[in-house]
Amino acid sequence: HLEGIIQGPGLHALLISAPFSDFGVIHPDFENIMQICNAHDIPVCLDLAYWGIAKNVHINLKDYPAIKEVTCSLSKPFYTLENHRVGVRFTKEYVDDGVSMLNEVKMANNYSMALGIEYMKNFSPDYNWQKFKSAYEDVCHENDLVWTDTVIFGLGDDVRHAEFNRGVSGNYRVCISEWLQC
């Protein structure tokens, strides 16, 4: 079933987040998905958008040759950086696109990049878990949410949290970031 979906008509690449955005943890079929993409030469972009608000993300890129690109935004771990649109992209091979062009002609927003670098220098990848772990556990407990590896997501049930279903049957991801304000 999964192979049929991944090999869908016109599929030229796969974008997958880690942790997976719908579950708040690494996708349960991540290994299988990567094997299928490798076997069928489907290039993968690994989106680490939740990197700075997640734990247990350990991916050895050497184990997954289909992963050709890794991206990471700094907007989720660092409040206010969403206004600066700053992140990092790593590619195995040169990509002739708008990002490369802006970098080559030195038109990237240096102020935003410098701000992102300062945040990374001053806050560890574990900062948000260290700061919000206790509040996260309390909010999840008070709202009957299952913990995830992403400090802003809890998983609910179909009775109280049906409105939070994002398309995966039986999955109800609840964003609790507003309840974590300190």
Walk through the language-model features, giving the residues of each.
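PLP-dependent class I/II
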Residues: H1-C182
